[in-house]
Amino acid sequence: AEAEGLYLQVEPVSTYAKPGYYMTTSDSAADIIRVVGSPNVKLLYDIYHMQLMEGDLVNTLRRNADIIGYIHIGDVPGRHEPGTGEINYPYLKHVLVDELGFDGIFAFELSPLTTMDACLEAMHAF
């Protein structure tokens, strides 16, 4: 991937979504990424999965900021749009963008709680 200028994203996933999955925390993925040692292998940090599996989102984001390349957004419970669950998305956005200087990709991977228009509005507000 590195020789071709491509990037690989390593995504830990919750056992709620994939029972028996072997890589379920940001640190387990980070260990693999750091052993590989390529700047083109990054952590895909899925906020929904990591809240379910480890919580403490701010500290895990800070600890792994140097290798995060992509972020999936979905609130808990239900994997709905930001603001519908327990995650403080305005604060996470502040930590990621203002404090850590994250300039990677944010992707909304969710199921709209109400209408698509309401979901799009929440996405724009983010």
Pin down the residues of each PLM region.
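Histidine-acidic metal/acid-base catalytic patches
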Residues: 3, 7, 23-45, 49-126
